[in-house]
Amino acid sequence: MYLIDTYDVIVVGAGHAGCEAALAAARMGCRTLLTTISLDNVAMMPCNPAVGGPGKSHLVKEIDALGGEMGIAADATAVQMRMLNRGKGPAVYALRAQSDKGAYHRYMKNVVENTDNLDLKQVQVMDIIVEDGKCVGINTELDEEYRAKAVILCTGTYLDSMIIIGDTMYSGGPNGMRPSVGLSANLKKHGLEILRFKTGTPSRVDRRSLHLEGMELEEGDPENHAFSFMSERKDRNKRNCWLTYTNEKTHDIIRENIMRAPKYAGKIHGIGARYCPSIEDKVVRFADKDRHQLFVEPEGLDTTEMYVQGMSTSMPIDVQYAFLRTIPGFEDVKMMRPAYAIEYDLLDPLQLYPTLEVIKLPGLYSAGQSNGTSGYEEAAAQGLVAGINAALKIQGKDPFILARHEAYIGSLVDDLVTKGADEPYRMMTSRSEYRLILRQDNADLRLTEKGHSIGLVGEERYARFLERKKKYEEAMDYIRTQRFTPKEEINRALESMGTAPLTTGTGADQILKRPEMTYWKMMEMLGCPAFDEEAVEEMEITVKYEGYIARQEAAVRKAARMENEKLPPDMDYLSLDGISTEAKQKMDKIRPLSLGQAARIPGVSPADISVLMVYVKQRKGKKGAE
C-alpha cells in the first residue's frame, strides 16, 4: 500500500448521505475526502426523480435548517412543486419537488468541488484500516492508502449489490454502475454484523411513445414554494406529470407470469420495503383491488425519459412490455431502461450509537441506506448527523444528538439505533409522536440555533433566520395583545365573513381560532396590519392549534426527564439482577445512552426500566460518596 494523503474525515460514497456528511465535516473546519466509485455518480437519483413527500419533506426542511444542502439543491433543480396532504392538518403538510436528475447531480457536484477543506476523488474502497481497535483510514483497489481520524461509510445500495431482472442476475450497482465488491467482506472480518436487503425501481419509458391525452394531467401548485429558508419562493413549475392506472388486463398478465417473478421463484433473498412494494406484490397482496395508480414523471428538462412511479418490478423484459402495454396511454410504449430489483449488503444499525459511530469500532461511522433506510431524504439526514458528529469528536466537543421531540431526524436515528431495521426503513409522519410540534414550517425555528452553535450554519443564513424569527414574533405579539370591542362596524364585518358577532371584548387570537377565520380575512375586514406571509402562516398554525400543541409540549417535558437520565457507557448490563435475560442482552448490544432510549428497546419492559433506575441511582450515590 502507498500512503497518498492524510485527512481529518474520509467519507466513502458520494450519494445523498455522503454529500451531506462531507459538506458538514468540511464546513465545520475538518479536512475532508469524499470518495466515489464514479465522479459521474455524485448525488445521483437512481430511483424516483423527486425530493420530499409525506414525512420526507420534514427531513429536508430540517437538513436545511441545520445548514445542509439538500433543500437548496432541490429548489435549484425542481421542475414542479406541489404541497401534498392539504386536506389534512398542518402537521402532515408535505412539500414534494419533481427534480431534474441530471441538474441535481451537476448542482451537488459543483457545490462539493467548490467547498473549502473538501477533496473529491474517484476510487474504489476495498478495506477500512483498523489499528488498536480503531478505524484509522481506507485502502483502495489500486493499493492506495488514505489515513483519517474518522471514516464515514455511505455506501448506499452498492455493497456486493446484485441486479435481478427475471432469470438474469449479475453483479452491479444502480443504473449500470459498478458495485462495491470486497468492502462488505472486510467489514465482516472486523466483527460487524451484515444484513441483506432488496429494493427495486420501475422502468424508464420514452415520452414520445406515450399517449398522454389518455392520462390525467397533474400540474404543479399555482402557489410559490421552497424547501430552503435560503431560497426565494417562486414559480418552479416547468413540466407536468400524468396519472394513469393499471387494470384487470394488467393484473391478469402479472398473475399468469407470477412464477417468473424472481421473488416468487425463490431467487430474491433480500428483505424488501413494505411501504414500496413491487407491482407483482401489489397484485398478490391486494387481490381485491381492480386498479393501482401510476404517476408518470419527467426525469428532467433535457431528456425524454419518464419514470413510472408505482410500477417497480423485477419481472422479465417480455412480461414488463406485456403488462405496460395494457395501461391507458402506454399502448405503444417503448422502454428506455428496464425495471429491476437490486439486492445489497448493509450494516445492522443496532451496532451504532445515536451519533452513528460504530460501537465496536471507534472512528468508524455509517449513514444512509447502508444503515437500512430507503430514500434520498433519510440518507441525507443521516449523512448530516454523521458528518457533524465526526467533526465534533475530532474537535473534542460534545456529540450532537437530536431527541425525538426536537426533530424527525431524531426519531429517524433513534428508531434505527434502538429498534433496528428488519426491512428498508421509510420515514413517515406517523413515526413521530410529536408531529404537531415538528412541522415542516417551523424547522428553522426549532433547529437553526443548534446548527449555528456547532458551526455549521453560516452568518448569512443565521442573519436571515433571525430576521424571520423577528417577523414571526412581531406577528405573534400583535395577535396576542390586540383586542376588539363589540362595536357595530366590527360586528358587521364579522357577520359578513360568516362568523358570530362579538358580545364582549375579545382578543384577536380568540377570533383567529374560529374555524372559518383566517388572518387574511381579519386584515381585509377588521383592518389588522399586514405581516410577512411566512410569519402569518406560522402564527395562524400556532394560534389555531394552541391547545394540541400545549398537550404535546407537556408530553415532551415528561419524556425529557427520562432522556436526561444518562446511562454510563461502561454499564455491565449482563451482571444486573432483576432484569430479564432478553433485556440484558439487548441493552448490552445496543448500549443505550439514556433511560429513555433503553425504554424504547423492543423486549425491555417497564419493570426492567424500574430496576435499571435503581441501579443508576445506587451508582450515582456511590460516586457522590467518593
Which stretches of residues belong to each language-model region?
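Short hydrophobic core segments
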Residues: 12, 145-156
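Internal hydrophobic alpha-helix adjacent to the cofactor/substrate pocket in enzyme cavities
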Residues: 379-400
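Conserved N-terminal/central alpha/beta ligand/cofactor-binding core
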Residues: 23-131, 142, 154-171, 178, ...
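Extended, charge-enriched "interface" segments that sit outside catalytic cores
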Residues: 431, 437, 448-608, 614-626
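Core beta-strand elements of the Rossmann-like FAD/NAD(P) dinucleotide-binding domain
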Residues: 5-7, 141-150
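A glycine-rich dinucleotide-binding beta-alpha-beta segment and adjacent secondary-structure elements
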Residues: 307-373, 401-414, 532-586, 591
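An anion/pyrophosphate-binding glycine-rich loop and adjacent beta-alpha core
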Residues: 38-40, 83, 184-321, 418-491, ...
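Beta1/beta-strand and adjacent pyrophosphate-binding region of the FAD-binding site
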Residues: 3-17
